[in-house]
Amino acid sequence: MDSYNKETIRNTYSAGLIHHLTLVVGLVCVGIGQTLLYTILGPASRKIGISDFSVGIIVTIAALVITLSSGMWGRLIDRLGSRNAYLAGMIFYTTGTLFLGYGLHISVNHSISALSAFYLLLVIRSLTGFLTAGIHPAAMTYVAESTSSKERGAGIALIASAYGIGSIIGPILGSVIGKVSFLLPILVASAISLLGVILGFLVLKPQKKSLTNKEKERILIRLTDKRVLPIFIGISLTYVGFSCFQQTLSFYVQDVFNLSPERSISKIGGLFATMAAFMIITQLLLIQIIKPSINFLLYCGMWSCVTGFMFLILTTQTFNGLYLACGFLGIGFGMMIPAIQSSASLAVTKDEQGGVSGFLFGASAFGYVIGPALGTYIYSINSNILFLICIVVTFLSVFSTRIVLNKK
C-alpha cells in the first residue's frame, strides 16, 4: 500500500510539473511579445512621427482596458476553468500580435498619417488587452489549485519567472533581427506564441466540474476587501515605478547617446535583457532554492530597486552605469513582485484564488494605467525627477504591503 501511495504521489507530481512547465512556455511567449513591444515601440514611434507622450497614452489606455476587464476575467476563470480561460487568452494574444505587426508596418512606411497611426495602434493594443487579460491570472490560478499554501509562494514565483524568461528572449530577438525590419521580430513572436497555444491544447486538462452560483459569489474579491486592499495599492505602486522606467528607457537611450531609431534597438534590447536576466536568476535560483521569507524578499527588493534608480540619476551618459542600474532593478522587482503577490494569495482561501488572481492582475494593470503616461510626461520635463518619483513609490508600495503582513 505504501509503495502504491508513493507511486501515485510521484505520478501526480510529474503530471503537475508537466502542466506547470506548459504554462511557463505560454507565459514565456507572452513575455517575448511584451518586451519586444517596449524594445521596438519607442524607436518606431519616432520614425512614425508620434510624440513620446502619445506612446505613453497608448500603453496607458490599453492598461486601463485591462484593469476594467480584470474583474470579469477573474469570474470567467472560476466559471470556465483556468485551462479554458488560459487557452482563449493565448489564442487572442497570437492574433493580436499579428495585427500589431501589421499596424506598425503600415505606420512606419507612412502608408497612413501619424495621427491615423496613433489611433490604429491604440485600438489594436486596447482590443488585445481586453481579450488577453485572463492569461496571467488563469495561469496563477492553475498553479494555486495544484499547490499547498506552503508551496504557493514558490509556485507563483515560477509563473513570474516565466515572464522573465520571455523578457530575456524578447529584447535579444528584437536587437538581433530588429535591424532588418520592425515587423520581423513581431512575426517571429507570433509564431512562437502559436506553438504555446498548441502545446496548451495537448497538455493542459479541462476542469472536471463547474462552480455553483453560491461558490461564484464567495470567490468574488472586491476592492473594498480589507484583507487585500493594501496589497492592491502596493502592487499598483510597484508597477507604476516599473512601467515608468520600462516605458521611458528607450527614449532615454536615444536622447542621452544621440542614437538613431534603428541603432538604439540593439542597445535597448541589451538593457532590457540584462534586467530580465537578473530578475529570472533571482526568481529561479534565490526564491526557488533558498525559499526566503516574504519580509526578506520585500525589503531586499526595495533597497535593490532604490539602488538601481540612484544609479540612473548618478551615472548618466555611461552604458556601464545603465547596465548596473538594470541589474539592480531586475533583482529588486524580481523579489518585490512575487513577495507582494504571495501576500495576497496567502491572505485568502483556496476557493478565492481565482478571484484574487484576477484582482492582482488588475492591480498591476492599474499601475500601467498610471505609469506610462506619468513617466513619459515627467521624462519630458526632467529624467532625474522621474527616477526620484520611482524611488518614492517603491517605498510606499512596501509600506502598504506591510499593513497586511503585520495583521497576519
Role assignments for model-derived ranges:
Residues 13-63, 239-258:
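Helix-loop boundary and gating motifs at the non-cytosolic
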Residues 294-340:
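C-terminal transmembrane helical hairpin of 12-TM major facilitator-type secondary transporters
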Residues 2-17, 205-233:
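Juxtamembrane intracellular "pre-TM" segments in multi-pass secondary transporters
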Residues 91-114, 304-317:
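C-terminal ends and interior cores of transmembrane alpha-helices
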Residues 124-163:
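Cytoplasmic helix-loop-helix junction between adjacent transmembrane helices
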Residues 64-68, 267-290:
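Transmembrane alpha-helices of Major Facilitator/SLC transporters
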Residues 28, 110-134, 320-335:
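Hydrophobic core of transmembrane alpha-helices in multi-pass small-molecule transporters
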Residues 69-82, 281-295, 379:
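Helix-to-loop junctions at the C-terminal end of transmembrane segments
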